[in-house]
């Protein structure tokens, strides 16, 4: 997966600092959804008082001629103040055309 520069998710970072949940933050990173299916999976480190969270956003059937789907991985860490901070964001694409249309790639679709 390709690492996304922090400048591209600055608005979501502010949401995290202001008390947004990990899922809210991940959806803010991924942006508006226009497609047929979206799946969100959240995995926390420690169940009752999570210290870290990984949120995966899978999107398929996008309304785009070249991009069939997207996969976002958003890693968050709990701060000493109790809010969340984004520690890393990665992204991959699934293309409609090409040699492997059923696999995610770190290269944007043509």
Label every PLM stretch briefly.
Residues 1-17:
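N-terminal low-complexity, Pro/Thr/Ser-rich intrinsically disordered segments
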Residues 1, 38, 68-70, 79, ...:
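Aromatic-enriched hydrophobic runs in primary sequence
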Residues 74-103:
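Short beta-strand edge/turn micro-motifs at domain boundaries
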Residues 9, 14, 39-43, 92-95:
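Generic preference for hydrophobic/aromatic residues in regular secondary structure cores
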């Amino acid at each position: 997966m390709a690492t996304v520069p922090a400048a591209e998710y600055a608005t979501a970072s502010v949401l995290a600092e202001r008390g947004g949940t990990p899922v809210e933050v991940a959806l803010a990173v991924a942006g508006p959804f226009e497609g047929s299916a979206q799946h969100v999976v959240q995995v926390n480190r420690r169940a009752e008082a999570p210290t870290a969270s990984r949120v995966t956003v899978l999107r398929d059937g996008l309304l785009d001629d070249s991009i069939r789907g997207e996969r976002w991985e958003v890693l968050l860490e709990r701060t000493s103040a109790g809010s969340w901070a984004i520690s890393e964001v990665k992204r991959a694409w699934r293309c409609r055309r090409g040699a492997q249309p059923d696999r995610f790639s770190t290269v944007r679709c043509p």
